[in-house]
Amino acid sequence: MSKTFFIDTTRCTACRGCQVACKEWQGFEGNQTKQVGWGSHQNPPDLNPKNYKVVRFSEQKLKDRVAWNFFPDQCRHCVDPSCKYPADEYKKGLVILDEETGAVIYTDACRDMPKDVFQQMLDFCPYNIPRRDEKTGVINKCDMCVERVKEGLVPMCVKAC
């Protein structure tokens, strides 16, 4: 049975525990970031090959105060993933939809994909999620901690929240 994420943004305090748990589970080091001139506490500023999840900050000026809204952003693991179409046009099997969990998985073979095909994948994704590591060619994003989910556990970001 396919799984999905439900994030109650009214309860999110932007602690970034989900973001850190994901990085630790994936074995990623911290990103070098700087806040100067950025004007936000969002850190890092966007998803990247070493950040599959980022807590987005949205500041709103209300009548008499400023309000912050937070949204943990990551792959939505679409039921019909549009990012899969350009990959399949290029070569079948690069992007798979795990039937047991519903996770959209980018295989290691994606690293050989030309940059223009990757750009089409990014353009097709309505959430602007996939990222390519320019050094290694690896295309990556949240994998829903598929190995944990298959063992009956929750993804690390969910566990941390």
Q: Where do the protein language model's features map onto the residues?
A:
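Non-ligating segments of multi-cofactor redox enzymes
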Residues: 1-160
